[in-house]
Amino acid sequence: MEKEVIAYLDNETIIDSQSVKNTNLKEIYFDNSKESLEVIRHSCAHLMAQAIKSLYPEAKFFVGPVIEDGFYYDFRVESKIGEEDLVKIEKKMKELAEAKIEISKYEITKSEALAKFQNDDLKQEVLLRIPDRAVSIYKQGEFEDLCRGPHVPNTKFLRFFKLTRVAGAYLGGDEKREMLTRIYGTAFADKESLKEYLTIIEEAKKRDHRKLGTELKLFTFDDEIGGGLPIWLSNGARLRSKLEHMLYKIHRLRGYEPVRGPELLKADAWKISGHYANYKENMYFTQIDEQEYGIKPMNCVGHIKIYQSDVRSYRDLPLKFFEYGVVHRHEKSGVLHGLFRVREFTQDDAHIFCMPSQIKEQVLEILAFVDNLMKLFDFSYEMEISTKPEKAIGDDEIWEIATKALKEALDEQGLKYGIDEGGGAFYGPKIDIKITDALKRKWQCGTIQVDFNLPSRFKLEYTDSDNEKKQPVMLHRAILGSFERFIGILTEHCAGEFPFFIAPTAVGIVPIGEAHIAYAKEIQKELLELNIDSEVYEKNESLSKKIRIAEKQKLPMILVLGDDEVAKRSVALRDRRAKEQKNLSLDEFIKLVKEKMSEVHF
């Protein structure tokens, strides 16, 4: 069957099929392409709003955008809407889709729109955010709403959708304002794609790091402590410590010097850096001796001061500083989400001070670091370069050198990458590292950011080979992004089945009876000498219960010890990752775990 056209593409702008006069534009067909899904999902948000309005006539609507994997709509109703109401709303949506209602667009002036929606305070809110120009309105049957579009031409295209959850959302994201109802949903062009997506969603629920974090006793949150402030339990702290120690060694082998900056800096430093003017609302401030101080949201200023603590020559460059820097950022309570979005987190942060001619060499080193680390955890990844925006500092030549260095480094490594033209920060181009997990979800983690701005603001300099003062380039670099976020992603990626070398408890030791506990503790001590954590299950419980408890903790290996094992100094091994059981001498087992630990190569 021939595909139907639902919209057109004008450069990067998607236009409704009913608005197009120039038929030379690229056609967008009804399929699962990125552009098509944007149109389908945008339209489906309106279909949902129309259904809600039909079921709850008093409903008033705020905004309903497309997001990465679907859409949502924020609205106000007198009734409390819960998960159980989604089925009823979906049923009404299907009726409207099957009615094949035409969708049309018309434009009015902003003043006309203000008059039209004078009795709708949420629409007034939306209009206040729109510039003084023509306002577009989309109409389908009795329902119409402000929207810039684009939309499909008829509701018949909106058949494969699912409403996924209900949440609360502050009006305009401002937690001081009223809480609206938000319903999330998704839509596709065919039934199979929707089914596949819903299967992934169900699997994601099982892997939710907040759920697993509780079950595996990794971390917790407490209202008396505050939102977005994770508390690491012993299992989580062990996992995190293993990751930190592993990365520390790798950093040293790659020529990075450990440093540490203060967590509290005078506001004057943040004024020089530009954070005070441009990032203040995301920072926490306090007064000490009648002077304002800011808790650091980033580690760069501390590292700059370390650079400035000595006279620098071109022979010293590149200088590579790294720190597990604890930072604090003011996040609105509505966006906090487990370990993914917190107010306190630790970055695996590094700053490299180098000459422009050294940028490519340094980026190559970072890319090799990224590749080794992602392979270790079985992540695939992709890169994206963001180039010079319209408003930028630094001369064109430096920008060209830096951008070329990033591209050449990626090309030399044979890495595919996208380009976000004009998407760079005003102070330099960057590479974003996006990893793909076991559920094919993409996560923004690491960044390689070239910075001409801070070296200029703080007047950094080095003496070149001609004995002249020059300004170094600064590279901001984080590979994990933050330990919190990465551990959250890793937990979901491996469903809590952590690799042996990083598992908080790598071995569960199950003595059958009291007579076998001493041997179990001997093995535990020997493992600890190898930096391998284990747990002895010595409670007076049945063997099957002890094994079941160990399995629920998703331990990589379980040892069962009885009379035979004690007498022969052996172990009955259950390797949960290899899915095998076997008997080994204690020496053979120790050799095996040493091999497991040596699998970490950099």
From Swiss-Prot:
GO terms for biological process: threonyl-tRNA aminoacylation. Zn(2+) binds at residues 300, 351, 476. Binds 1 zinc ion per subunit. PROSITE patterns: AA_TRNA_LIGASE_II. GO terms for molecular function: ATP binding; metal ion binding; threonine-tRNA ligase activity; tRNA binding. InterPro entries: aa-tRNA-synt_IIb, aa-tRNA-synth_II, aa-tRNA-synth_II/BPL/LPL, Anticodon-bd, Anticodon-bd_dom_sf, Thr-tRNA-ligase_IIa, Thr/Ala-tRNA-synth_IIc_edit, ThrRS_anticodon. Pfam families: HGTP_anticodon, tRNA-synt_2b, tRNA_SAD. GO terms for cellular component: cytosol. Signal peptide: none annotated. CDD domains: ThrRS_anticodon, ThrRS_core. It comes from the Bacteria. It is found in: Cytoplasm. It catalyses: tRNA(Thr) + L-threonine + ATP = L-threonyl-tRNA(Thr) + AMP + diphosphate + H(+). Its EC number is 6.1.1.3. Its cofactor is Zn(2+). Residues 208-499 are annotated as: Catalytic. Keywords: Aminoacyl-tRNA synthetase, ATP-binding, Cytoplasm, Ligase, Metal-binding, Nucleotide-binding, Protein biosynthesis, RNA-binding, tRNA-binding, Zinc. Homodimer. Catalyzes the attachment of threonine to tRNA(Thr) in a two-step reaction: L-threonine is first activated by ATP to form Thr-AMP and then transferred to the acceptor end of tRNA(Thr). Also edits incorrectly charged L-seryl-tRNA(Thr). Belongs to the class-II aminoacyl-tRNA synthetase family. NCBIfam families: thrS. This is Threonine--tRNA ligase.
